[in-house]
Regions:
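Hydrophobic alpha-helical transmembrane segments and immediately flanking/interface helices
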Residues: 75-85, 197-222
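Membrane-water interface of transmembrane alpha-helices
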Residues: 18-25, 81, 145-159
Length: 261
């Protein structure tokens, strides 16, 4: 039993424990928020997907056989998992229409990754797809950078809204926001390291796991600090977005004052 197998096994146990903690924390929330709960189960599914990936790596020995072979499997699994985590984060911040746009964009990028993978196998007749690996890595980085930019925009907008309209403690939200961005940036930085050197993975891997743990804890803390007034703000924002859309496309009426309505 070598050190790589032990690292993969530790990551597998870590993902299972974190998925269990995030799922079970549902029993300890004071107020239930449908948007937050959707995000919770997105993150749980993503963590379980990452755990399954480590089982595959241990069972078939892709990473042990070759760094590039293991990296191909990593990208195929990491992309949808990190997209799910990103959408779970974004779901708390954004309106439903914006979330649908993000889902379509992430799905399109992952479809492109699958297409590159299939073309690479067809050309090289093996999982060693050579230059296709770097195209897949580039697409993965594009996906994560896109998610980061969208999340940061919504976080700034929502923080300003909460400061203006809600007299609540913003510290849990600020911690959650920072942890969200940190875990996504580490995803961008860790993937090239995972491709070029398994040795460096022993250093970067624990750092990513600690960041993921901190994110999960701040996510749970955010749910524990939730109060119903925030859900009213969410509904108000969505209603404003819906009214703006109807007015823009002629699907509704626009009133200057309450008396005219």
């Amino acid at each position: 039993m070598n050190s790589l197998f032990l690292l993969q096994f530790a990551c597998f146990i870590f993902m299972l424990i974190n998925a269990f903690i995030v799922a079970v924390s549902y029993l300890h929330v004071r107020w239930e928020n449908k948007r937050y709960e959707r995000s919770r189960w997105m993150i749980v599914v993503a963590l379980l997907g990452l755990a399954i990936q480590y089982v595959i790596q241990m069972g078939f020995g892709f990473r042990a056989a070759d760094d590039s072979l293991g990296a191909v499997v990593n990208i195929l699994v990491y992309t949808p998992c990190f997209s799910l985590i990103s959408m779970g984060i974004y779901n708390i911040e954004a309106t439903r229409s914006n979330l649908r746009k993000m889902i379509m964009m992430c799905s399109g990028i992952y479809a492109a990754i699958i297409a590159v993978f299939c073309v690479g196998i067809r050309l090289h007749h093996s999982l060693y797809i050579r230059e296709g690996l770097y195209i897949m890595l580039a697409l993965f980085c594009v996906s994560v950078i896109y998610c980061i930019s969208m999340i940061i925009q919504e976080m700034i907008r929502r923080k300003n809204m909460l400061e203006t309209m809600a007299a609540t403690d913003l510290l849990p939200y600020v911690r959650y926001s920072r942890a969200s961005v940190v875990i996504l940036w580490l995803a961008v930085l860790a993937m090239p390291v995972a491709i070029f050197s398994t040795t460096l993975l022993y250093i970067v891997g624990p750092a990513v796991l600690l960041a993921l743990l901190f994110f999960n804890l701040t996510f749970i803390a955010l749910g524990s600090s939730y109060i119903p007034t925030e859900e009213l703000l969410d509904k108000e924002v969505e209603n404003d977005a819906l009214v703006g859309t109807k007015y823009r496309y002629g699907g509704g009426t626009f009133c200057q004052t309450a008396d005219l309505c």
